[in-house]
């Protein structure tokens, strides 16, 4: 328990609140101070790697863009492959895509068609779970590729935005792990 409290305190101490960004009334959670601190960044990626191993994942999918920053070193530490899930049009070659609804419109994410296959167990990694739209689309994409969802791991969950409730049906019993609850 003490170790969990210590990592929680360390991570929280390195996340900066930026008021009125990107628009008035929003408090942006800036993780760049955490990334700049080798001890905090190592603790974070180590915790994500441990969750990856605990849930039997064979690959990590990192969601654009901060999921790349967190997921790649976690994959190295866990000894698993790393797969970037990008916004549509950013990957060369054959891709699988998944559209999802936003509050005002829609968006689309993609993965290389050959990167996920039957037998893969995939942990989705991102910095924040907010409304859950991108994470939900990534789970659909992973399953369409024939892979299995091992879980979703995030640095922080913004509980007041309801992402967990939205994601619950798509998880289909897979775990959602948030290192911090905001």
From Swiss-Prot:
* Keywords associated with the record: Cytoplasm, Glycosyltransferase, Purine salvage, Transferase
Name the EC number(s): 2.4.2.7
Principal subcellular localization: cytoplasm
Pfam family of this protein, just one?
Pribosyltran
Where does it reside?
Cytoplasm
How would you classify this enzyme at the top EC level? transferase
Highest taxon, organism lineage: Bacteria
Q: Which reaction does it catalyse?
A: AMP + diphosphate = 5-phospho-alpha-D-ribose 1-diphosphate + adenine
**Which pathway does this polypeptide act in?**
Purine metabolism; AMP biosynthesis via salvage pathway; AMP from adenine: step 1/1
Q: Which PROSITE patterns match?
A: PUR_PYR_PR_TRANSFER
Q: Which GO terms describe its cellular component?
A: cytoplasm
- Any GO BP: purine ribonucleoside salvage
A Gene Ontology molecular function term for this protein is:
AMP binding
Q: What does this protein do?
A: Catalyzes a salvage reaction resulting in the formation of AMP, that is energically less costly than de novo synthesis.
Q: Which family does it belong to?
A: Belongs to the purine/pyrimidine phosphoribosyltransferase family.
User: Which NCBIfam families is this protein grouped with?
Assistant: apt, PRK02304.1-3, PRK02304.1-5
**What interactions and quaternary structure are annotated?**
Homodimer.
The protein's name is: Adenine phosphoribosyltransferase
Look up and give the organism this protein is from: Streptomyces avermitilis (strain ATCC 31267 / DSM 46492 / JCM 5070 / NBRC 14893 / NCIMB 12804 / NRRL 8165 / MA-4680)
């Amino acid at each position: 328990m003490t170790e969990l409290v210590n990592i929680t305190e360390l991570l929280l101490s390195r996340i900066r609140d930026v008021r009125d960004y990107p628009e008035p009334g929003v408090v942006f959670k800036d993780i760049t101070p955490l990334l700049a601190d080798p001890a905090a960044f190592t603790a974070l990626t180590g915790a994500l790697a441990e969750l990856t191993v605990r849930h039997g994942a064979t690959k990590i999918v990192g969601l654009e863009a901060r999921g790349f920053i967190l997921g790649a070193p976690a994959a190295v530490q866990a000894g698993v492959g790393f797969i970037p899930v990008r916004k549509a049009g950013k990957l060369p070659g054959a891709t699988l895509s998944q559209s999802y609804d936003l509050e005002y419109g829609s968006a689309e994410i993609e993965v290389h068609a050959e990167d996920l296959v039957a037998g893969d167990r995939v942990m989705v990694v991102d910095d924040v779970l907010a409304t859950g739209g991108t994470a939900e689309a990534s789970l659909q994409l992973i399953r369409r590729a024939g892979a299995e969802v091992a879980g979703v791991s995030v640095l922080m969950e913004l509980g007041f935005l309801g992402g967990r409730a939205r994601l619950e049906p798509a998880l289909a019993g897979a775990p959602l792990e948030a290192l911090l609850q905001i």
